[in-house]
A protein has these predicted regions:
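Domain-level recognition of nuclease-like catalytic cores that cleave nucleotide substrates
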Residues: 417-447
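Bacterial N-terminal signal peptides
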Residues: 31-43
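N-terminal secretory signal peptides that target proteins for export/translocation
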Residues: 1-26
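Cationic, glycine-rich low-complexity segments
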Residues: 56-182
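Acidic-basic catalytic patches of nuclease active cores, encompassing PD-(D/E)XK
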Residues: 280-367
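Amphipathic interfacial helices
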Residues: 123-177, 184-246
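Membrane-engaging insertion elements
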Residues: 168-189, 253-294
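Conserved catalytic cores of phosphodiester-cleaving nucleases, focusing on short active-site segments
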Residues: 342-407, 412-414
């Protein structure tokens, strides 16, 4: 069994939180600060930040660049959306503005922009379904009485559910696991939707459209809910071909996928079953119950976040440090950091599987550090663009000068899913840190 250790306080071109309508400026600034906080840890007693500031003649200011300099031409605009003219970049993430037929959006990272483009195409496809004869017929069928039961369930769920035989619950959910989880995450459907199999239809449509069924995009959720209710209550049936044809743009923006097993599980199983499987997997890894509970009961983590993280840790079979990473991910306090932890886990699994086997995993300065058998320590970061700032340079100096070495280390590498500024490239080089840019092309993420 691994010994849990408390973590320290703490993309390819083109993810962190995106809601509709557009966030207020204060909300955006707050979320950005939380993302930065994941990477930043300074012990004032070391004087590290001050020393770094004195040793560096210049730092990068925030960047404002033309969107055409950052985003591939094919993604600048589509049938239902248009990117804003500029991209703002702070220390780690690119910030976008998007106008669309379904309202404005502000995706605060490359990966979230890719996700939004797929979601916009999915929304358009779902709206086509609303206009179809099949949807109109299903709506009529739903109005003949099936919906009344749903309305009763929504208005008085306790008394309605109490009349359902116990055997039904074994089909629609794991009551004991739901109790262990202490409720559902902010991304999941309610009791009514689950009991009426609406959630099952939502997962099916989300899979066909290549979108995350637990997405926080409110417009997408509204459209998915509408079509899924018609399917559950009105026997709406649609062939796979009709879904795929209208979603061709999604495939172009999707790219290669890793951890397909995790993705398939999320699309196939209800949240309670995912939680049960994840709990058992954590037990087999030797993760203490108290750590597993903290992780699975953190409702900022969606079932998708949790499942991808657990499947990634399973890939690192027998490696010391997995408990520390689960404990680290359990600290997610908003959707942005939840996604960041998921992507870190994906990068670790991808590196271990396709580059070099990892022998040990530690959390240092709130950043996962992987140690290989080739005397290499590697830091894998799902960030869009690294600017050389007082904070980022301080982290780099600490990694170069005081990184713990539980295994022999002769070489330190930093892999970024995005790229780095000229100053950041030079700064890392002076510290003898090898920089690998655009790692997302070699280690693609699920978005």
């Amino acid at each position: 069994m691994e010994t849990p250790s408390e973590p320290s306080a703490q993309h390819s071109k083109l993810e962190i939180s995106m809601h509709h309508p557009v966030r207020t400026r204060s909300r955006a600034v707050f979320s950005l600060a939380l993302v930065i906080a994941v990477f930043v840890f300074f012990n004032r007693s070391t004087g590290l930040a001050g020393d770094t500031a004195q040793s560096q003649a210049a730092f990068d200011p925030p960047e404002v660049r033309p969107s055409s300099d950052v985003v591939p031409p094919a993604l600048l605009h589509g049938p239902h959306y248009q990117l804003g003219p500029t991209v703002k970049t702070f220390t780690f993430m690119n910030q976008y503005s998007v106008t669309s037929d379904y309202g404005p959006f502000s995706p605060p990272s490359d990966a979230r922009l890719r996700r939004l483009i797929r979601e916009i195409a999915a929304i358009a496809e779902l709206k086509k379904i609303h206009e179809s004869d099949a949807f109109a017929k299903a709506t009529v069928e739903a109005g003949k009485g099936v919906v009344q039961g749903a309305q009763n369930l929504i208005k008085d769920p306790v008394s309605t559910i109490s009349a359902v035989p116990e055997a039904v619950f074994s089909v629609f959910g794991r009551v004991s696991e739901a109790a262990k989880r202490g409720g559902r995450s902010q991304y999941e459907d309610g009791v009514a939707q689950n009991l009426l199999a609406v959630s099952s239809f939502k997962r099916e449509y989300a899979q066909k459209l290549d979108v995350d069924v637990y997405s926080s995009n409110q417009v997408l959720q509204k459209e998915l809910n509408s079509v899924a209710w018609a399917a559950a209550a009105g026997n709406l049936t649609l062939g796979a071909a009709s879904m795929v044809t209208g979603a061709a743009v999604l495939q172009a923006a999707s790219g290669l996928r890793t951890l397909d097993q995790a993705k398939n599980l999320v699309n196939a199983l209800p949240a309670t079953e995912l939680a049960r499987r994840n709990r058992e997997a954590l037990r087999q890894m030797g993760v203490p119950n108290v750590v597993a509970d903290r992780f699975l009961q953190n409702h900022v983590l969606s079932p998708r976040h949790e499942t991808v993280i657990v499947e990634a840790m399973k890939t690192l079979r027998g490696i010391p440090g997995r408990t520390a990473f689960i404990q680290y991910a359990a600290r997610a306090d908003n959707e942005d950091t939840a996604l960041l932890f998921q992507e870190m886990a994906e990068l670790l699994a991808g590196y271990h599987r396709t580059v070099t086997p990892i022998r040990r995993l530690d959390i240092y300065l709130n950043i996962p550090v992987a140690y290989t058998g080739q005397e290499i320590a590697v830091v894998l970061l799902p960030i869009d663009r690294l600017l050389w700032t007082e904070r980022s340079s301080g982290i780099a100096v600490s990694l170069a000068q005081s990184l713990p070495k539980p295994l022999p280390v002769q070489h330190l590498e930093v892999w970024l899913t995005g790229d780095a500024s000229i100053r950041a490239q030079e700064g890392l080089k002076q510290l003898s840190i090898t920089l690998v840019e655009h790692a997302g092309e070699r280690l693609p993420l699920l978005d």
